Regions:
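N-terminal anchoring/stem segment of glycosyltransferases
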Residues: 1-70, 126-128
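Short, flexible turn/loop "capping" segments at secondary-structure junctions
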Residues: 2, 113-116
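Residue-level detector of short, conserved catalytic/binding motifs and their immediate flanks
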Residues: 6, 119-120
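GT-A fold catalytic core of metal-dependent nucleotide-sugar glycosyltransferases
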Residues: 54-114, 121-127
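Flexible, glycine-/basic-rich loop-and-beta segments that form/coincide
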Residues: 131
Length: 131
């Protein structure tokens, strides 16, 4: 049974590394009954990894626009999902994510980190504020 209230999205480049991870993630999401949009993208000439990752926000916005009643979760294509915990899937938050390295607030060491959020998994709710 597919959950109708959420969708997982990601994109990947067509090289062997990322396309094989896309295939594995797609299979996991299908097994879990989680709707998904996994998009193959082409890198522009001269585009590097940082340029490619900057396309993430526009892509997520397009998934939100196409799915206004669904929570939208971004998962890096080379991540694995064994299950989606209820406290995440059923969250009513506008924005949900994990802090860097998935640590507790006492372990993060803000002075040692350049970013608070772990960019590999985060989600948006369906409220106007979230979108």
């Amino acid at each position: 049974v597919t959950r109708q209230d959420l969708i997982v999205c990601s994109f990947y480049t067509p090289d062997n590394y990322y396309s094989s991870h896309a295939k594995a993630l797609r299979a996991e999401l299908d097994r879990l009954g989680i709707d998904h949009e996994l998009l193959e993208i082409k890198k522009a000439p001269g585009e590097d990894w940082a340029d490619t990752t900057r396309r993430k926000i526009g892509f997520i916005k397009s998934v939100c626009d196409k799915n206004p009643t669904k929570k939208v979760f971004w998962v890096d294509i080379d991540c694995r999902i064994n299950y989606l915990p209820d406290y995440i899937a059923n969250s009513t938050a506008d924005l949900i994510g994990f802090q860097r390295s998935f640590g507790s607030p006492l372990q993060i060491g803000y002075g040692n980190r350049t970013r608070f959020w772990e960019p590999s998994f985060w989600g948006l709710g369906t409220s106007p504020q979230a979108r």
